[in-house]
Swiss-Prot record:
The EC number(s) this enzyme carries: 7.1.1.-
Protein known as: NAD(P)H-quinone oxidoreductase subunit 6, chloroplastic
The species this protein was found in: Aethionema grandiflorum (Persian stone-cress)
UniProt GO cellular component terms: chloroplast thylakoid membrane
Gene3D superfamilies associated with the record: NADH-ubiquinone/plastoquinone oxidoreductase chain 6, subunit NuoJ
PANTHER family tied to this protein: NAD(P)H-QUINONE OXIDOREDUCTASE SUBUNIT 6, CHLOROPLASTIC
A Pfam family per the record: Oxidored_q3
Main location: plastid
GO molecular function terms listed in the Swiss-Prot or TrEMBL record: NADH dehydrogenase (ubiquinone) activity; quinone binding
Membrane topology qualifier: Multi-pass membrane protein
Coiled coil region boundaries: none
UniProt keywords, alphabetically: Chloroplast, Membrane, NAD, NADP, Plastid, Plastoquinone, Quinone, Thylakoid, Translocase, Transmembrane, Transmembrane helix, Transport
């Protein structure tokens, strides 16, 4: 969006703080319904940040897929859970939980180090080369594919990692 500097900075800080408080709410709420609504708020803040950075396609996909479908599905699934089953096991910490936490922390730090060590200048050169190719393409789906693999590569990968974690969590909850 073409906003004046102070308004853009205010919206960035406002959405960032909303994202931070919403994500803290996802983790700290003991009621799963409140946690799911807080997740929906986080996903809306992320899509508004995409709009603020002129990534309208990714913002629309974020709103339609994650806020519109995934969050509603999570709330629907949480409403059918047996509440007494989860309230009695809150204070248990098993060896498997510790191993899982260690593995997830290791994966998180390896992802952070990979992102920090990646030379993003090569991605800029790839984008400039693909702009020449983009003019010759006829199909919109090919243009979307090029944009997802160049301009929106990092958000696309982060969203896919979030989906993978949600899928693994849903499978582990379903197996119990």
């Amino acid at each position: 969006m073409d906003l004046p500097g102070p308004i853009h900075d205010f919206l960035l800080v406002f959405l960032g703080s909303g994202l931070l408080f919403g994500s803290i709410g996802v983790v700290l709420f003991t009621n799963p319904i409140f946690s799911a609504f807080s997740l929906g708020f986080v996903l809306v803040c992320i899509s508004l940040l995409y709009i603020l950075s002129n990534s309208h396609f990714v913002a629309a996909a974020q709103l339609l897929i994650y806020v519109g479908a995934i969050t509603v599905l999570i709330i629907f699934a949480v409403m059918f859970m047996n509440d007494s089953e989860y309230s009695t096991d809150l204070n248990r910490w098993t060896v498997g939980d510790g191993i899982t936490s260690l593995i997830c922390t290791t994966i998180l730090f390896s992802l952070i180090s990979t992102i920090l060590d990646t030379s993003w200048y090569g991605v800029i050169w790839t984008t400039r080369l693909n702009q020449i190719l983009e003019q010759d393409l006829i199909s919109n789906s090919q243009q979307i594919g090029i944009h997802l693999s160049t301009d929106f590569f990092l958000p696309f990968e982060l969203i896919s990692i979030i989906l993978l974690v949600a899928l693994i969590g849903a499978i582990s909850v379903a197996r119990q």
